[in-house]
From Swiss-Prot:
Coiled coil: none annotated. GO terms for biological process: translation. The lineage of its organism: Bacteria, Pseudomonadati, Pseudomonadota, Alphaproteobacteria, Hyphomicrobiales. GO terms for cellular component: cytosolic large ribosomal subunit. Belongs to the universal ribosomal protein uL29 family. It comes from Allorhizobium ampelinum (strain ATCC BAA-846 / DSM 112012 / S4) (Agrobacterium vitis (strain S4)). The keyword Ribosomal protein applies. This is Large ribosomal subunit protein uL29. Keywords: Ribonucleoprotein, Ribosomal protein. GO terms for molecular function: structural constituent of ribosome. It holds the Pfam family Ribosomal_L29. SUPFAM superfamilies: Ribosomal protein L29 (L29p) (SSF46561). Gene3D superfamilies: 1.10.287.310.
Length: 66
């Protein structure tokens, strides 16, 4: 996910996306533990996407207060 895509989302959509990313991260960790993970770089991509979504959600919340 690109930052521009996340910025275009509403706060509710960001929450939904964050939930989806956390579920995906859990599944990837589970696959890694069981030796079924084929694309290990996806773990880092998802981790960075989670950080990106959290950052943008926080920025939007700060803008709403100001």
């Amino acid at each position: 996910m690109k930052a521009a895509d996340a910025r275009a989302m509403s706060a509710d959509q960001l929450k939904d996306e964050l939930g989806n990313l956390k579920k995906e991260q859990f599944n990837l960790r589970f696959q890694k533990a069981t030796g079924q993970l084929e694309k290990s770089s996806r773990i880092n991509e998802v981790r960075k996407d989670i950080a990106r979504v959290k950052t943008i959600a926080r920025q939007k919340a700060a803008e709403a207060k100001a």
